[in-house]
Curated annotation (Swiss-Prot):
The active site is at residues 238, 294. The lineage of its organism: Eukaryota, Fungi, Dikarya, Ascomycota, Saccharomycotina. Keywords: Apoptosis, Hydrolase, Protease, Thiol protease, Zymogen. GO terms for molecular function: calcium-dependent cysteine-type endopeptidase activity; cysteine-type endopeptidase activity. Residues 1-97 are annotated as: Disordered. Involved in cell death (apoptosis). Pfam families: Peptidase_C14 (PF00656). This is Metacaspase-1. Its EC number is 3.4.22.-. It is an enzyme of class 3 (hydrolase). Residues 16-41 have a biased composition (Low complexity). It comes from Eremothecium gossypii (strain ATCC 10895 / CBS 109.51 / FGSC 9923 / NRRL Y-1056). Belongs to the peptidase C14B family. PANTHER family: METACASPASE-1 (PTHR48104:SF30), METACASPASE-4 (PTHR48104). Signal peptide: none annotated.
């Protein structure tokens, strides 16, 4: 049964608001062995039953000629610098032969000789995730959750959309997918036959990242998941915002992802993604999501978001007002009228909600509604009110956040959740304004070891 059927979900609220309904599945989505790429990443595929977008996603109200991610390189940033590091120590044995004990060994390997750059945060002690069930309220043991040991089966869904031949075209998203795929296989024992890869340079129409294919693949990813399984979702492409209809967003906006056919079939909203990927998971199942897109801070609608100090971030309307004002001013100085008007519109909305009290979302109610006993972790490319950069590193187009994740984990594999967030921000600081975000389906001990 489709997750959320028979209870209030985003689909029922959106029945009159556009094409967000459940796709019509004719058969169960099975992951055939992905074909290897036989063409350059930037070569667009032939038309196979979908229409490439002729204009950019509408969520920012940009004119077609103004929509880029970003419209120009960051000030003071020269292209063709940096790059993905050479792979570090591989796992023992070939990835296809890895057993559960080998995967567990990778989580406890001694990486003391791989400290990473001096600028990185270096955890003094990294504790493994506890095996015991945890309780949301120690005084009330009725609500529990469980960390995953990540020693079971492993599946991955990797999505990269360049939006070829459109004014919304990106250059690094398909490269991101290839880099993440290679990283998961070489470091964490994922197998290519247990991956579904959707990119818009492929000939097989089943592998084009249309809305129906993405939703079908999301169902495949979580189907049959058991405690200690490790699931991985990576999305690199356009993101945006739309009006929040169920009152679970402090800023009044839902995060959205844009499939390649968004013009005809619409975007994918965070409530829908949460219904499919988070709600069905049992305690102890791990889903790690890496969302490299604009406005992606709440792309999975996870209720607990953490700061670089390791504490839960609470909504701050006055801080939002200051942030929107600064973004509008910077856009004015740089001549980016599209960004300026978007920031001013967001500022007006924030001030209005502060004045009327209409933005008073019941944070505790939202946390109870979006809480999951599973172990769902998301690193997103930016805050809900930020854009993410389509960057160039070492002469190769890439998403800035995807690049920082692979680089940090390759140069210093022994990370806590907190140090990983801090070090990813360190990698981007000075070159990009975006700030990667960390969120979770349950209260998270950010000083535990980050495992996959």
């Amino acid at each position: 049964m489709y997750p959320g059927a028979g209870r209030p979900t985003y689909h029922k609220q959106q029945e009159q608001k556009g094409p967000y309904g459940q796709p019509q599945y004719q058969q169960q989505y099975a992951p055939p062995y992905p074909e290897r790429y036989q063409q350059p990443y930037y070569q667009p595929p032939p038309h196979d039953g979908y229409s490439r977008p002729s204009m950019p996603p509408p969520s920012h109200n940009y004119a077609a000629a103004q929509y880029e991610r970003p419209s120009c390189p960051p000030p003071g940033y020269a292209p063709h610098q940096g790059g993905f590091p050479a792979p570090g120590p591989p796992l023992q044995g070939r990835p296809r032969d890895l057993m559960r004990s080998d995967i567990q060994m990778n989580h406890s390997m001694d990486y003391s000789n791989i400290q990473g750059p001096a600028s990185y945060t270096r955890p003094e002690f990294v504790a493994p995730p506890p095996q015991e069930r945890q309780f949301l309220d120690p005084g009330n043991r009725s609500v529990e959750y469980q960390y995953s040991q990540c020693t079971g089966n492993r599946k991955a869904l990797l999505i990269g959309i360049n939006y070829f031949n459109s004014s919304a075209e990106l250059r690094g998203c398909i490269n991101d997918v290839q880099n993440i795929k290679n990283f998961l296989i070489s470091r964490y024992g994922y197998r290519e036959e247990n991956m579904v890869i959707l990119t818009d340079d492929q000939h097989d129409p089943v592998r084009i990242p249309t809305k129906a294919n993405i939703l079908r693949a999301m169902h495949w990813l979580v189907q049959g998941a058991q405690p200690n399984d490790s699931l991985f979702l990576h999305y690199s492409g356009h993101g945006g915002e739309t009006e929040d209809l169920d009152g679970d967003e402090q800023d009044g906006k839902d995060s959205t992802l844009y499939p390649v056919d968004f013009e005809t079939n619409g975007h994918i909203v965070d409530d829908e993604i949460h219904d499919i990927l988070v709600k069905p998971l049992a305690p102890g199942v791990r889903l790690t999501a890496l969302i490299d897109a604009c406005h992606s801070g709440s792309a999975l609608d996870l209720p607990y978001m953490y700061s670089t100090k390791g504490i839960i971030k609470e909504p701050n309307v006055w801080k939002d007002i200051g942030s929107n004002s600064m973004q509008a001013a910077m856009a004015y100085v740089t001549g980016n009228t599209g960004d300026m008007f978007t920031s001013l519109k967001s500022l007006a909305s924030t001030v209005s909600r502060k004045a009327t009290g209409s933005g008073g979302v019941d944070t505790e109610r939202v946390r109870q509604t979006k809480f999951s006993p599973a172990d769902v972790i998301m690193f997103s490319g930016s805050k809900d009110n930020q854009t993410s950069a389509d960057a160039v590193e070492n002469g190769v187009a890439t998403g800035a956040m995807s690049y920082s994740f692979v680089k940090v984990m390759s140069q210093q594999p022994q990370q806590t959740y907190l140090s990983l967030l801090q070090n990813m921000r360190t990698e981007l600081k000075g070159k990009y304004t975006q700030k990667p975000q960390l969120s979770c389906s349950h209260p998270l001990d950010v000083n535990l070891q980050f495992v996959l």
